[in-house]
Design a protein with these regions (language model features):
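Anion-binding and metal-coordination hotspots
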Residues: 3-10, 19-422
């Protein structure tokens, strides 16, 4: 803000934008800073701006929310990766843990097993917390590099308009925030027909959620994580009728138990495996027993893999590089979001919503201009922005006045954000 005020004192374009003449004194930077703290902290101001611009894009018919593209990207935090403290924290339980526990016990009872006792103690883990910005999270980039970062979980449509976003610490996995982003979009738009995601979201629960809600999941192929020289899991055929697996040597692996993570365990007969010619390609177990796991929601994953081969899924997934990946590329390359200069989850969320609002606004202004529906004097992106702000009566007392206490033009208030994101 200090540098912005300094630039305004000598930059004619900035003065013109905020409506100040050459002789009019510029307010002190603390006037704007304190006014923001008093009026807009802990409010939904920036989300309201984002939604209002998105509403305008919908009005012009530019938004196509029938197919969603959801992904996340990491933005480096304004924090030194060498300045941290180690803390012991409780592991956060999965949002669907109660549903999973209930179905695990039902499955165990159906197989003649006792239900698992409810876990009372919460597991703990050691994490590194930045002393500069405690809200960010340590993100492992590649095999060696570790940086403190934030994750921007984002959803866009087939035209590249951002429909929803959520910011979390960088150590939160993408799949844990998927449902929050999806529900955020569903509050504004009708339920999508399809959702395209990358392999990080290919989990049993997400597959179940989408299929149960009659949403078409569009997910990629994932390579089997098997040691080289060993049989792949798909070479063990599951027999649904007899609830067993058949190994490549046509021997039976019978049900053993269902564990606390929701996986059924099937085991072979060690006496048969001991003399099997494929033993070295099957297992390294010292007791000559092969075990295969299958999640209780594996049927949903199998349906996802079946849909992956359809022409519709192939066409939708091929659009990811033109939609959500393009959004992240523009955000970092054209809007200065390779790293954030702000600290704290609240401020970074504010910055993210402003950046995405600006991206939607610029795309809408460009499309209006190309379609010939925008008047000549309204082609300027800032002009459209001001018109949209005028339609937010809850945010401003009157045009040109940011507050009753501080007589400051709102163009001056938003100028530093537009400089950063423009």
């Amino acid at each position: 803000m200090r540098q912005t005020i300094k630039e305004i004192e000598t930059n004619v374009a900035y003065r013109w934008f905020i409506g100040y003449d050459f002789s009019q004194p510029i307010p002190h930077f603390t006037t704007l800073g304190k006014n923001y703290v008093r009026r807009f902290r802990d409010t939904q101001l920036f989300e309201s701006i984002f939604l209002r611009i998105l509403e305008e894009a919908v009005h012009h018919g530019f938004v196509k929310p029938d197919v969603l593209f959801i992904d996340a990207t990491h933005v480096k935090a304004s924090a030194n990766k060498h300045k941290y403290v180690k803390e012991i924290v409780e592991e956060q339980a999965k949002k669907y843990q109660e549903l999973l526990d209930e179905e695990i016990n039902q499955d165990r009872i159906a197989h003649g097993k006792k239900p698992l006792e409810k876990k009372t103690e919460t597991s703990k883990k050691e994490v590194k917390v930045s002393t500069t910005d405690p809200d960010c999270g340590l993100f492992v980039k590649g095999e060696k590099e570790r940086v403190f970062a934030y994750s921007f979980h984002t959803a866009c449509d087939r035209n590249g308009f951002v429909l929803g976003a959520k910011v979390t610490p960088g150590n939160v996995h993408d799949s844990q925030v998927f449902e929050d982003v999806l529900n955020q979009v569903r509050k504004t738009f009708a339920q999508p027909q399809a959702v395209a995601v990358d392999s990080g979201y290919k989990t049993p629960y997400i597959s179940k959620t989408l299929l149960d809600d009659q949403i078409r999941p569009v997910m990629p192929y994932t390579r089997p994580r098997t040691k080289e020289g060993f049989f792949k899991k798909h070479e063990y055929v599951y027999d649904e009728y007899f609830d067993c697996y058949i190994c490549p040597n046509e021997q039976i692996l019978t049900y053993e138990t269902t564990n606390k993570d929701g996986y059924r365990i099937y085991r072979s007969n060690s006496q048969v495996c001991r003399s099997c010619p494929f033993l070295k390609q099957c297992t390294e177990s010292k007791d000559y027993t092969k075990r295969v796991s299958r999640h209780i929601w594996a049927d949903y994953l199998e349906e996802v893999d079946h849909l992956r081969h359809t022409e519709e899924n192939k066409q939708i997934y091929s659009k990811r590089k033109e939609t959500i990946e393009r959004v992240f590329a523009d955000m970092k390359e054209k809007h200065g979001m390779r790293w954030t200069t702000l600290r704290g989850l609240e401020k970074v969320t504010m910055q993210a919503m402003l950046v995405f609002a600006a991206m939607n606004l610029k795309k809408m202004a460009t499309w209006l201009w190309k379609s010939g529906r925008q008047k000549v004097n309204d082609q300027n992106t800032f002009g459209i922005f001001i018109k949209l702000l005028n339609k937010l009566p809850l945010l401003f007392v009157q045009r040109g006045s940011l507050s009753a206490i501080c007589e400051t033009d709102y163009g001056l208030f938003f100028l530093p954000f537009l400089i950063d994101i423009g």
